[in-house]
Amino acid sequence: RRFGSPPIRSTATLGGNIANGSPIGDSMPCLLALDATLTLRRRGARGKDETRRVELQAFYTGQKRTVLQPGEYIEAVEFSRPGPRQFRAHKISKRFEQDISATCAAMSWCDDGGRLTDVRLAYNGLTPFPARARELEAAIEGRRPDELDVATLDDVIARSYTHRDGLRATWAYRALVARNLVLRFVQHEAAALAAAGTGER
């Protein structure tokens, strides 16, 4: 509902959003949390098409830098449907649409007896390119939603990222939002577990 305006959604492509490599591209956190893989294609030296598969998390080498070779393009984006896995994403911006993110977060996980497992969490706006939040994933992995505390998340975020203000948001604001989005996602899971225990949905 918040991904671009109707004109952008009518003309833009997912491959273009990925290949652009913007630090605040909105599709990439979602695809990283879903462990997406790209198929890259180009015309080879002998006139035959050559393809290769690259995990999205290995696609970026720096700000607006990718592993794409001359003449190569993104042919396909593949990921598994969440199924029993939980998935949430949220974009923070000043306007509802036609605005660039201050940050966007996406998280996927599985419920293992009330514990969050196989956690994948990704952000844009915190690093030179959209990336998985590995240390935060480790801090969340195996815990129940009510076991996550603000101090731990704040400490991990402070240790994991360069504290740099941007044109659209200060570092302090982005760090606060990054933590609160994790809490929002896991609180949704806690509510779902409580509803499942009472037979309500």
Regions found by a protein language model. Give the residues of each.
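C-terminal structural segment of proteins
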Residues: R1-R201
